[in-house]
């Protein structure tokens, strides 16, 4: 049994350590093992087994498991191994693998059934595709939670300004406690949120807000995630997806309550101790929010988000550029051993309209298609195997390929044959609308012969014919819709030419226009709701069409007018007062725009952004935004001035009511002493003085600062003469009111 048992030193041996100079270990007598250190026992088979005590010097790790039992390492720098020989052997094995990869054909076979969307999901910040500035801004917002969550101090930025202690958060959290990401679906908003949260050291807990509709259950779930300790070692970051699909009284109401409770707790921590009542009622005590919340939505101007947006840091996520998406898809093809041409990848990007998940799914489908075709074509010649053209020979032609074929004529084929072939492809494709839109977008850039503009004038009539046929879908059950397939063939007859040999990669503007139209429609709907709440009478005479074409353009023009050059102060103040009232009527707010960068203080913008609905020319947009910056700053100063005046008037009114209340209480007590009489006249003097201050403040609203200073300097004095004494000459019942008649 002892002879056949393998020695433990032979386990896990590597071929790399089989060479080199090895010294033999000395025997038992040489290393000085005594007979007392040898112990014997009888095994279950009756054999006697001797165990030798391990020497103390061998317990220091000089014997390796990769060596024989009778060998030890050398004590010199080489450790008994020829390092140069090992390096040469590793380089030779690496060259063999490289040559094998070069000589082996690219088959494009898939080794597992894993979805590529999950396989190539970004794991870290550097794996994200596009939107580098936006991603850094989101990472910077999460980084601001480090002092409150991880108890670490952030390094000061060189551009950071000194702020007073009263303006800082006591826990050094960001000003906005919720990060709101919005953008079109399919561009990776949720993936970005997960990656930046994990990159910052948080464990992600995701909730789909549109599915969570039960109020008490959702509230308990959110409170457990944000305020209770979890089994995970990392702090939790709450990610709420599809928040625009939730009802206002459900998920969003809970978030608003959390933010209001956090504001109360922060104010108590800054300005005073909590009340004794709050100590007794611990369940209703305000709680500080110490965990970040990331919300994701598609529609920023949804009605349910109006109450939540003031607490949010809003970041727009845009679709990645075609160049960055092409680089990522090309990398995936290289890693998956797929030989797909760049032109085919560009077609995938156009077909998916910038949707990263859609591109990767289509790429995996094409790879599996190549794999199945290669396996079924094993009996074909080698020249017909493993080519992109042969694998996609029987696949349907995409609509943008048909668009390019419509502008290309083959001089070696009959025109009639080409016409019927293209007609068959258009009818079988099922995307006649996209084909026609692509023809309309591409025909100004193709080569064709024309004297004047006769051909474009002719095609405009056929486009009108297509609109009439398309309307039959709603009027005649689509009976005339089949004639719309002839309109793309008119482009073939009119603009087809043999000089159009290269494909024109069109910019598919349909998706962008649809998203822009949806965003502008949401902005107009939000303004209509504001008008109905603020001015119901005005809302009854205002519709969406008049608001877009008649009201908003003139309102934007008035705000953009350069009234800072007016030297007449009264006229300037009057204009600013009217503009402030207009902003108040439409509930347009002036907010700070920080879209250029997270640490860069941007200019003021109007929320909701009416300039996106009104301004269409990009050059005019830049000019108006540059001119409007000073105007918005002046309007914001005027709004703050009106708020300060209103607070002063409210304070004076409150003091007047308090003094009147005190006066009425003293009248009821019936104090008739001389001291009380004197105090009464003093109180009346103070009351009259406060009344005059209130009247002066109301008169100075809307006037110049100079006139306001002159009015404030005017004072009114009251002289009261009182002769104390008693006389019986005239006796008459005198009431208290008679004294003041």
From Swiss-Prot:
It is found in: Nucleus. GO terms for biological process: DNA replication initiation; double-strand break repair via homologous recombination; maintenance of DNA trinucleotide repeats; mitotic sister chromatid cohesion; telomere tethering at nuclear periphery. InterPro entries: AAA+_ATPase (IPR003593), ATPase_AAA_core (IPR003959), P-loop_NTPase (IPR027417), RFC_lid (IPR047854). Its main location: nucleus. It comes from the Eukaryota. The keyword Iron does not apply. GO terms for molecular function: ATP binding; ATP hydrolysis activity; DNA binding. Keywords: ATP-binding, Cell cycle, DNA replication, DNA-binding, Nucleotide-binding, Nucleus. The keyword Flavoprotein does not apply. SMART domains: AAA. One of its GO terms (cellular component) is nucleus. Essential for the fidelity of chromosome transmission. Required for the DNA replication block checkpoint. Component of the RFC-like complex CTF18-RFC which is required for efficient establishment of chromosome cohesion during S-phase and may load or unload POL30/PCNA. During a clamp loading circle, the RFC:clamp complex binds to DNA and the recognition of the double-stranded/single-stranded junction stimulates ATP hydrolysis by RFC. The complex presumably provides bipartite ATP sites in which one subunit supplies a catalytic site for hydrolysis of ATP bound to the neighboring subunit. Component of the CTF18-RFC complex, which consists of CTF18, CTF8, DCC1, RFC2, RFC3, RFC4 and RFC5. CTF18 interacts with ECO1. Belongs to the activator 1 small subunits family. CTF18 subfamily. PANTHER family: CHROMOSOME TRANSMISSION FIDELITY FACTOR 18 (PTHR23389), CHROMOSOME TRANSMISSION FIDELITY PROTEIN 18 HOMOLOG (PTHR23389:SF3). This is Chromosome transmission fidelity protein 18.
């Amino acid at each position: 049994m002892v002879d056949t048992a393998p020695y433990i030193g032979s386990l896990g041996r590597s071929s790399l350590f089989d060479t080199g100079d090895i010294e033999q270990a000395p025997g038992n007598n040489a290393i000085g093992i005594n007979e007392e250190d040898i112990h014997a026992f009888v095994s279950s088979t009756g054999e006697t087994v001797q165990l030798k005590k391990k020497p103390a010097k061998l317990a220091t790790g000089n014997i390796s498991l990769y060596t024989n039992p009778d060998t030890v390492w050398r004590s010199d720098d080489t450790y008994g191994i020829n390092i140069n020989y090992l390096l040469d052997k590793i380089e030779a094995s690496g060259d063999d693998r490289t040559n094998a990869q070069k000589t082996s054909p690219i088959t494009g076979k898939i080794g597992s059934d894993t979805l590529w969307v999950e396989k190539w999901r970004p794991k870290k910040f550097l794996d994200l595709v596009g939107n580098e500035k936006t991603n850094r801004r989101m990472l910077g917002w999460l980084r601001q939670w480090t002092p409150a969550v991880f108890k670490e101090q952030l390094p000061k930025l060189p551009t950071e300004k000194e702020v007073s202690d009263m303006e800082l958060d006591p826990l050094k959290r960001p000003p906005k406690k919720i990060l709101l990401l919005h953008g079109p679906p399919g561009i990776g908003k949720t993936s970005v949120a997960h990656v930046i949260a994990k990159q910052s050291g948080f464990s992600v807990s995701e909730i789909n807000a549109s599915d969570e509709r039960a109020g008490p259950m959702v509230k308990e779930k959110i409170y457990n995630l944000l305020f209770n300790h979890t089994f995970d070692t990392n702090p939790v970051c709450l990610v709420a997806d599809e928040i625009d699909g939730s009802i206002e009284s459900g998920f969003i109401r809970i978030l608003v309550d959390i933010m209001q409770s956090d504001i109360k707790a922060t104010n108590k921590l800054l300005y005073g101790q909590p009340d004794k009542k709050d100590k007794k009622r611990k369940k209703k005590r305000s709680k500080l929010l110490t965990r970040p919340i990331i919300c994701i939505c598609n529609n920023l101007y949804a009605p349910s988000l109006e109450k939540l947006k003031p607490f949010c840091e809003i970041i727009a996520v845009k679709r990645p550029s075609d160049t960055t998406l092409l680089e990522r898809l090309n990398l995936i093809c290289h890693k998956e051993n797929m030989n797909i041409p760049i032109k085919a990848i560009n077609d995938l990007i156009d077909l998916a309209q910038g949707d990263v998940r859609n591109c990767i799914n289509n790429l995996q489908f094409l790879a599996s298609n190549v794999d199945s075709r290669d396996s079924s074509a094993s009996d074909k010649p080698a020249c017909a195997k493993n080519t992109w053209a042969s694998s996609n020979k029987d696949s349907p032609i995409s609509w943008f390929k048909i668009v390019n074929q419509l502008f290309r004529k083959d001089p070696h084929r009959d025109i009639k044959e080409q016409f019927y072939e293209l007609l068959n492809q258009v009818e079988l494709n099922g995307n006649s609308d996209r084909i026609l839109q692509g023809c309309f977008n591409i025909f100004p850039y193709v080569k064709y012969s024309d004297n004047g503009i006769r051909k474009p004038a002719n095609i405009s009539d056929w486009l009108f014919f297509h609109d009439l046929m398309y309307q039959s879908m709603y009027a005649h059950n689509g009976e005339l819709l089949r004639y719309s397939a002839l309109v793309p063939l008119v482009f073939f007859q009119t603009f087809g030419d043999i000089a159009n040999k290269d494909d024109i990669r069109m910019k598919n503007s349909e998706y962008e226009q649809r998203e822009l139209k949806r965003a502008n429609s949401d902005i107009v709907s939000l303004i209509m709701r504001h008008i109905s709440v603020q001015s119901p009478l005005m809302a009854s005479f205002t519709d969406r069409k008049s608001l877009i074409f008649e009201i908003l353009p003139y309102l934007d023009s008035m705000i953009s007018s350069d009234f800072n050059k007016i030297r007449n102060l009264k006229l300037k103040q009057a204009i600013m007062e009217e503009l402030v009232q207009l902003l108040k009527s439409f509930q347009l707010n002036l907010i700070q725009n920080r879209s250029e960068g997270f640490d860069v203080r941007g200019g003021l913008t109007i929320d909701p952004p009416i300039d996106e609905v009104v301004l269409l020319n990009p050059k005019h947009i830049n000019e108006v935004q540059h001119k409007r910056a000073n105007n918005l700053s002046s309007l914001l100063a005027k709004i703050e001035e009106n708020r300060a005046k209103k607070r002063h008037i409210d304070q004076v009114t409150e003091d007047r009511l308090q003094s009147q209340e005190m006066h009425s209480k003293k009248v009821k007590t019936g104090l008739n002493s001389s001291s009380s009489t004197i105090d009464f006249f003093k109180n009346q003097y103070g009351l009259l003085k406060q009344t005059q201050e209130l009247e002066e403040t109301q008169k100075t609203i809307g006037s110049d600062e100079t006139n306001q200073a002159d009015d404030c300097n005017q004072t009114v004095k009251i002289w009261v003469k009182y002769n104390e004494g008693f006389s019986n000459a005239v006796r008459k019942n005198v009431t208290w009111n008679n004294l003041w008649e």
